[in-house]
Amino acid sequence: KNWASMLDDHVCYFGIVDMHAITVKYSPAELRKNTLSCVAQYIACGLDPERSNIFVQSHVTGHTELAWLLSCITPIGELQRMNQFKEKTAKLGFNVEKCSDLKFIHEGARAGASVNSGLLMYPVLMAADILLYNADLVPVGNDQRQHLELCRDLAQRFNHNYTDTFTVPEAYIPKQGARIM
């Protein structure tokens, strides 16, 4: 409902972020089903495909290409400090705060758990999802605000180091639904 209300005043892009979904264990058949279901839900919620752009992330190669470029200017330490990364690794039994990088890897391997690089790079892919379309306003939940701040930092870093290429986006956090976007 929040997104549908933006269609009159903005050029809107809505992604089915199937590549983000594979940062955790998944079933390919279930992912395909969920992708189609997400498109149907977008339309059922009032997102008019004639007035907005709905895309499947993995079908637009620019997302991964830009994510790679952004990863080359993203320090690993910035990614390891992301709250969502810490929370997800804690669920696997890791404590990012108390482990050196090498100890973190060895302890995880001994315990039979692992943290994949996709989980660590999730916010870089999210930044690519946003910057690819030169978005100036991004609806995010409070839980994603830190990722948007990284996106802003990456846009500014790229623009400073190379050329003014990216729009530095602002967060749009609606009062209603701020945690479920």
Roles of regions detected by a PLM:
Residues 1-127:
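N-terminal Rossmann-like or analogous alpha/beta NTP/dinucleotide-binding catalytic cores
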Residues 86-181:
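Active-site cores that bind ATP or allylic diphosphates and position pyrophosphate for catalysis
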